[in-house]
Amino acid sequence: MAIRKFKPYTPGTRQRVVTDFSEITSAKPERSLIVSKHRVKGRNNRGVITCRHRGGGHKRQYRLVDFRRDKRNINAKVAAIHYDPHRNARLALLFYEDGEKRYIIAPAGVKVGQNVISGESVPIEDGNAMPLSVMPLGSSVHCVELYAGRGAQMVRSAGASAQVMAKEGDYVALKLPSTEVRLVRKECYATLGEVGNSEIRNTSLGKAGRRRWLGRRPQVRGSVMNPCDHPHGGGEGKAPIGRAGPVTPWGKPALGLKTRKKNKPSNKLVVRRRRRVSKRSRGGRDS
């Protein structure tokens, strides 16, 4: 997979960088694996906005993705690589020997015609799913379960991978993409390799309209609002914030505030916390 740059024929193409979609082998999804999905547009069940800047965008159909990989010891052939409008990663369409079809997150390097399998005694190859207890130390994994049988909950985005660091007792230490080292039960399943489409980080939308197509509405700075709408608002001209640091629209500190509960039960499974991102590298966007 590669990226595609455009010549500056228009202002919208000047900064536009997209993936070339060369790995996509079929434009139409598998009809038996798509369902309609209600677009909530950032609202809750009462219609109140709970997530700002959401709404609009192109119509989508949700692809049913197999995050459990619970068809054990049955060979599956990669029939096609499909585009998924709900995520940056691609989907691999699997045809199992018993006739069933399923989608999985497409690992990097997986080709059409390749065979993948899940189980405890399967080859150590990218795309195969197995318990963490049988994976070699130092191997890269993705689609990791937090609880056995619940399905993959971590390391599912494009280009992401975790590393098997150590095994001790009933737990396996994983280094996550955030640099956090966390203990996971050894019977939890994961898939070898990293998620494909890693070049997505080098793309650029190029214009505001492409962001609207993806269902994202404009984000207005708090400093240009009125005082009744945002703590940063008001003042004459380009007035400063007037506080020690930037805050959210509800008055909470916007940068550096830890939101994880101090007494969360899973804290004992975190061996090393993720690396802190400095304000300089994070940027102080006016929320």
From Swiss-Prot:
Gene3D superfamilies hit by this protein: 2.30.30.30, Nucleic acid-binding proteins, Ribosomal protein L2, domain 3
SUPFAM superfamilies given for it?
Answer: Nucleic acid-binding proteins (SSF50249), Translation proteins SH3-like domain (SSF50104)
Entry GO terms, CC? large ribosomal subunit
Q: Return the InterPro entries for the record.
A: NA-bd_OB-fold, Rib_uL2_dom2, Ribosomal_uL2, Ribosomal_uL2_bac/org-type, Ribosomal_uL2_C, Ribosomal_uL2_CS, Ribosomal_uL2_dom3, Ribosomal_uL2_RNA-bd_dom
Sequence segments annotated as region (Disordered)? 221-287
Listed NCBIfam families: rplB_bact
Q: What does this protein do?
A: One of the primary rRNA binding proteins. Required for association of the 30S and 50S subunits to form the 70S ribosome, for tRNA binding and peptide bond formation. It has been suggested to have peptidyltransferase activity; this is somewhat controversial. Makes several contacts with the 16S rRNA in the 70S ribosome.
Instruction: Spell out the protein name for this chain.
Output: Large ribosomal subunit protein uL2
Which species is listed as the source? Prochlorococcus marinus (strain AS9601)
